[in-house]
UniProtKB/Swiss-Prot annotation:
Written domain comment of the UniProt record: The reactive center loop (RCL) extends out from the body of the protein and directs binding to the target protease. The protease cleaves the serpin at the reactive site within the RCL, establishing a covalent linkage between the carboxyl group of the serpin reactive site and the serine hydroxyl of the protease. The resulting inactive serpin-protease complex is highly stable.
Region of interest: RCL: 324-348
Organism: Oryza sativa subsp. japonica (Rice)
Pfam families: Serpin
Family: Belongs to the serpin family.
Residues annotated as site: Reactive bond: G338, Y339
GO CC term (a single one): extracellular space
Superkingdom of origin: Eukaryota
Entries under InterPro entries matching the protein: Serpin_dom, Serpin_fam, Serpin_sf, Serpin_sf_1, Serpin_sf_2
Protein name, per record: Putative non-inhibitory serpin-Z11
One function term, GO molecular function aspect: serine-type endopeptidase inhibitor activity
């Protein structure tokens, strides 16, 4: 099992102390590290494979290729990977081919920003944005200006997006909120002395023909909202989410339950973090150490001083609009296989779910128990951190 989710504890705990909203994508971090590992060797590669829970680079690349294939199969899912290379470097052919085949990465040779006479970044260079995606849609361009120092030679860029689910009503695709989800359900838990409630919202998946896919081949996305009973229970809840194996998916409600009243505030915010410091604390320090990093499998003409990762930043955004603030009732989960055929267990009494104090949320792929995003809301009125 990889350790990417543990970065959320270091960054998320700081955000709680600062009373800030927070969101983090372990999936996007894993994608970036997996691509970087393709160009690593020696102790650097060993550390990265151990951190990502893979025995060999071929296993890691196969996993990345499988995820990319799934992302490309569904129009709701978007994944982008770009490698920006200074003109002075030439990437190894094997690195470029693996980056494209297993990670969806495409590269561009460009002149990265240089400092002017006052030390500021030269603004003459145009903004660059590369995407490897299944279809072509208008997209926002991201500039490198102000983000890249004069000594930078390679920039990796990753982007993943799970936009709001959509339904097809004959007049085109329109965004939908949790009211249009396939089913909603909730449950109450007690874990290591901490009581909390979980609200689960499943969403429809629409195929490229515009039809809702109910088949077993469709990914099954849902949002889980974790509400601690105690107002100050968020930090304890976050610690369990990142340290207990499969905690998030183990807390998925599985019993039939009515949830009323059920209210979640609308919120919209983004947060960013420099993952390098957190990764070093977790034992992945070699790629960020100028004296220890070994990225010799990336470029043919690696500089004498070598290459290392100076910064690894991640910025995520989330929005739950007014359409999704109130769920009237919970729907039902499938019958538990522990019951004999024909027997229906007694329905528990209704559960209220009113998120009026800090809560945690996760966006997961239910079938594969994969956490795509993990975050918390301290103040829903704050938009950007």
């Amino acid at each position: 099992m990889d350790q990417c989710l543990q970065v959320a504890w270091i960054a998320g705990s700081d955000a709680i102390t600062e009373q800030s909203n927070f969101i983090f994508s372990p999936m996007c971090l894993r994608a970036g590290l997996a691509l970087l590992a393709t160009g690593a060797d020696g102790e650097t590669l060993r550390q990265m494979l151990a951190f990502l829970g893979s025995e060999h680079i071929h296993q890691l690349n196969a996993t990345s290729a499988g995820l990319l294939a799934e992302m490309q199969a569904w129009p709701q899912l978007v994944f982008a990977a770009g490698i920006f290379v200074d003109r002075s470097l030439r990437l190894r052919p094997e690195f470029k081919s693996t980056a494209a085949a297993a990670h969806g990465g495409i590269h561009a040779i460009c002149g990265l920003p240089e400092p002017d006479h006052e030390g500021a970044l030269n603004q003459r260079h145009p903004p660059w944005h590369l995407e490897q995606r299944h279809d072509v849609r208008p997209c926002e361009r991201h500039a490198l200006q102000g983000e890249v120092g004069s000594d930078v030679r390679v920039v990796e860029h990753h982007a993943g997006n799970v936009p709001p689910p959509r339904r097809h009503d004959g007049a085109g695709a329109v965004p939908v909120g949790p009211r249009d989800a396939l089913r909603r359900q909730g449950a109450k838990f007690e874990f290591h002395g901490l009581e909390f409630k979980v609200l689960q919202l499943f969403y429809k998946m629409v195929g490229r023909d515009g039809q809702v896919d109910f088949g077993f081949g469709a990914p099954c996305f849902c949002m889980l909202v974790f509400l601690p009973i105690k107002r100050d229970g968020l930090r304890h809840l976050l610690r369990m989410a990142v340290t207990e194996p499969d905690f998030v998916t183990r807390c998925v409600p599985r019993s039939r339950q009515i949830v009323t009243p059920c209210k979640v505030p609308k919120f919209k915010f983004s947060s960013q973090l420099d993952a390098g410091g957190a990764l070093a604390q977790l034992g992945l320090g070699a790629p960020f150490d100028p004296d220890a990093a070994d990225l010799s499998r990336m470029a043919v003409n690696t500089p004498p001083a070598g290459l290392y990762v100076s910064t690894m930043r991640q910025k995520c955004a989330v929005e739950v609009d007014e359409e999704g603030t109130t769920a009237v009732e919970a729907m039902y989960s499938p019958s538990s296989p522990g019951y004999s055929p024909g027997y229906q267990p007694p329905r528990p009494p209704p559960m209220s779910f009113v998120a009026e104090h800090p809560f945690m949320f996760a966006i997961v792929e239910y079938k594969k128990a994969q956490v795509l995003f993990l975050g918390h809301v301290m103040d829903p009125s704050k938009e950007d951190q």
